[in-house]
Amino acid sequence: MNLTEDCMVFEDVAIYFSQEEWGILNDAQRHLHSNVMLENFALLSSVGCWHGAKDEEVPSKQCVSVRVLQVTIPKPALSTLKAQPCKMCSSILKDILHLAEHDGTHPEQGLYTCAAEHDLHQKEQIREKLTRSDEWRPSFVNHSAHVGERNFTCTQGGKDFTASSDLLQQQVLNSGWKLYRDTQDGEAFQGEQNDFNSSQGGKDFCHQHGLFEHQKTHNGERPYEFSECGELFRYNSNLIKYQQNHAGERPYEGTEYGKTFIRKSNLVQHQKIHSEGFLSKRSDPIEHQEILSRPTPYECTQCGKAFLTQAHLVGHQKTHTGEQPYECNKCGKFFMYNSKLIRHQKVHTGERRYECSECGKLFMDSFTLGRHQRVHTGERPFECSICGKFFSHRSTLNMHQRVHAGKRLYKCSECGKAFSLKHNVVQHLKIHTGERPYECTECEKAFVRKSHLVQHQKIHTDAFSKRSDLIQHKRIDIRPRPYTCSECGKAFLTQAHLVGHQKIHTGERPYECTQCAKAFVRKSHLVQHEKIHTDAFSKRSDLIQHKRIDLRPRPYVCSECGKAFLTQAHLDGHQKIQTGERRYECNECGKFFLDSYKLVIHQRIHTGEKPYKCSKCGKFFRYRCTLSRHQKVHTGERPYECSECGKFFRDSYKLIIHQRVHTGEKPYECSNCGKFLRYRSTFIKHHKVCTGEKPHECSKCRELFRTKSSLIIHQQSHTGESPFKLRECGKDFNKCNTGQRQKTHTGERSYECGESSKVFKYNSSLIKHQIIHTGKRP
């Protein structure tokens, strides 16, 4: 008997459907039918079909069972197999899948698409590839029919499979071809191995599961719900990560500082910080050095930069020509590279598939996610070769290095001022154009920058404009103070604080310095004082300030005074002081300024602009610092305490000035009479007395005055104006001390003598009275 009578061809195992029957099947049934036919066809193609093989030598055989199919398989030693699958079988496969009428319509279309109307049509194309290319022919080396064995082996990877369909899927992965396509993306992907590229565009996937998962981005489906808070997720993996965040679970702990992480990969990345010479990417140093040592034969004729490949050079040259060939079909924006267009298009679709495992923030691409994760790991792989400072991103390093080089590539076309960064010159140009695009909805004030608007809007709320103001505000202690001083009425939290305070009234100073015999009320004051006699710092703030001394080399030296600077920009700013260069002139008074921002602040004097409003009382201020100082009046905040007398102050500089009373310091010396004065304001007034200077002249009578306030009071004599009037008696006063004069009507006597309990209206009267008890004249 002829052996070919026991052998099967594809017609023997093919399952046919009529047009009507095919229309009844749903998508899942059609996919199942296609997969079964594809598996059977692939198996027959691998062993050779027996159409027209009657005249050929029939080899000895062994049989393998696949589902219900008995296929005769020749021994591998024989060379009688056909080089290509049978064209007749290929035609039968097309007829079965009802695709013959579409032959040649789209010869390069992919196997599966997201759109249902293209599903069957694109299946035909992958099968044509199977019939034309040896690359798709599975190769079998173990042909045993024992159940459970892995009878199909991939020749490229050596991996074994139990079914030929699994082998076919693996060979698809090895080839890099993507059989599943989403036509809704509108993205065209190019590559040597991606032969199934739809003319309509579409994203490709190796697995059908990947296509289904991707399609959730189009329909907005989020099937995975967290039971605790009801948060929905598109992927199960994202739900698992979120659950770890919600529970605070951080199973991976670093050995250096005990920092914990949700994912092991984040821990590994973080540990690179503690190792010397870590790289920014996950590659070993030897491989990194090999990359750096590769020849770069393709050189740019414009800037001399060299590249590894011709493609990299072509891409780089677009930066010189300004060519932007890739256009977004949504907003019309152009891009230099296709990858940037693809990334930009995700802005329109809202697709953010990459989630940070630490904070749950979503990103459009893995590159941006990788950059973001450096915030959590603390990784700073880019080091400045000049000052040794580390940066998280290369772009930040490049900007920083311009400071050392003194490069100011971007110049203002109006005034010629140069800037290191492009966005700085864009912001600067708004000064010349007067453009203020950011307007406050509360007071309609406009700003050049959005950050200025955000800062300004805090004025209209109860929020603090600065973090330091919030910290100072939190120091206000609102706890009850039950311990009251019988001498001055001051209250304290504890009995110990009260006892320490009462030493001020008794004059007791039990703690004496062994070096200079100076005595103190409190032991802490003595300890603080003794640091003066050592090399230690008296205050922690002084130590912190000392640590800020920069020991880095300062290569930029001023030729006038010899002072050295870290950067060229700092030297340029310093030299303006030496040369007296003041390019910014006030149009009102002709005064010149070194910087434009100082001119802007100065011009508020002429315009009367007071942009900073107190949200409590509605008062306006010219400067932000003045507003911050004023707001402490409403909060009652006095965080700065004098260590000598316990008095509190709103500002640190007022405390410093006050402490001169205890130290006896008088830093201001009059050059005319040699007198020393404690305060600058007193010194200015005194200096005018010594020199006879009277700069303020009355326009009516030409009388001169030393101070502007004196001139204003004098001018009221010409106008007859008396701006200060008492409500009780209607009497007018030129000066604003109406509060003191009201005591005449109210009978208030707020100043009491501690010795005789006698009370007085004015503090000056009390001081005069106390001379009776002490015998001392102030």
Curated annotation (Swiss-Prot):
Q: Give any Gene Ontology cellular component.
A: nucleus
Q: Location of the Glycyl lysine isopeptide (Lys-Gly) (interchain with G-Cter in SUMO2) covalent cross-link? A: K761, K768
Q: Which UniProt keywords apply?
A: Acetylation, DNA-binding, Isopeptide bond, Metal-binding, Nucleus, Repeat, Transcription, Transcription regulation, Ubl conjugation, Zinc, Zinc-finger
**Which residue intervals define the domain KRAB in the entry?**
8-101
| Modified sites of kind N6-acetyllysine | K466, K539
Q: Which InterPro entries match?
A: KRAB, KRAB_dom_sf, Znf-C2H2_ZIC1-5/GLI1-3-like, Znf_C2H2_sf, Znf_C2H2_type
As for subcellular location, the record says: Nucleus
Q: What is its main location?
A: nucleus
Q: Where are the zinc fingers (C2H2-type)?
A: 152-174, 196-218, 224-246, 252-274, 298-320, 326-348, 354-376, 382-404, 410-432, 438-460, 483-505, 511-533, 556-578, 584-606, 612-634, 640-662, 668-690, 696-718, 751-773
Cite a single GO MF annotation: RNA polymerase II transcription regulatory region sequence-specific DNA binding
Q: Name one GO biological process term.
A: regulation of transcription by RNA polymerase II
Q: Which PANTHER family match?
A: LD28458P-RELATED, ZINC FINGER PROTEIN
Sum up the protein's function in the record's words.
Answer: May be involved in transcriptional regulation.
Report the family membership.
Answer: Belongs to the krueppel C2H2-type zinc-finger protein family.
What is the name of the protein in this document?
Answer: Zinc finger protein 749
Organism, as annotated: Homo sapiens
Source species taxonomy = Eukaryota, Metazoa, Chordata, Craniata, Vertebrata
Gene name, Swiss-Prot/TrEMBL: ZNF749
